[in-house]
């Protein structure tokens, strides 16, 4: 019972690729918050695990171009079939931001690699469970490379398994973790609706 109360269903099957579709509202809330904080994004946004294209579709509403990487074609027209962890800096233009919902089990690898690819001052936003704050290995990473902002949602965000329709609410809390490469101050909390 305690597992269920903590938002974990021990009977639930995880998607083998950790493919959970981001609710569009989550991306819109992020874009609005970045605007409110005067965090300007460059013209190009990269999604490291594009899936069905929810993140690029949303950022395009704000006038940005987008490219997306994935290990499988899940229907977004601009998908580049390549594991993001193998992308090299010369594969990308000089000025871009990263907005992603990576596989949870590989999230730290995706964040580290993304930060390595970004120029100083570059922005990386990663959609994660709030429990991403926990764990000794992530604590060490956060101590050395703190996010500029942690943006938790006050209303639960629903993530669809494999793009399926979400029928019920979620017991899992999510947040955007936002890095500005080179910034080392303590993170600020920005509440999202």
Regions found by a protein language model. Give the residues of each.
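Class I S-adenosyl-L-methionine-dependent methyltransferase catalytic core
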Residues: 1-193
């Amino acid at each position: 019972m305690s597992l269920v109360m903590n938002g974990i269903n021990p009977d639930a099957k995880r998607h083998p690729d950790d493919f959970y579709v981001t609710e569009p509202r989550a991306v819109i809330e992020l874009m609005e918050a970045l605007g409110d904080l005067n965090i300007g994004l460059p013209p190009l946004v990269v999604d490291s695990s594009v899936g069905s294209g929810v993140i690029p579709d949303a950022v395009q509403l704000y006038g940005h171009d987008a490219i997306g990487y994935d290990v499988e074609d899940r229907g977004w027209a601009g998908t580049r079939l390549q594991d993001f962890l193998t992308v090299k800096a010369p594969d990308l233009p000089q000025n871009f931001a990263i907005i992603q919902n990576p596989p949870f089990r590989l999230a730290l690898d995706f964040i580290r690699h993304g930060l390595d690819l970004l120029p100083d001052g570059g922005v990386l936003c990663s959609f994660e469970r709030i429990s991403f704050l926990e764990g000794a290995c992530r604590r060490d990473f956060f101590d050395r490379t703190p996010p500029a902002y942690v943006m938790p949602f006050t209303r639960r965000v629903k993530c669809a398994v494999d793009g399926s329709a979400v029928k019920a609410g979620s017991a899992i809390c999510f947040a955007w973790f936002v890095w500005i490469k080179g910034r080392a101050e303590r993170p600020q909390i920005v509440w999202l609706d």
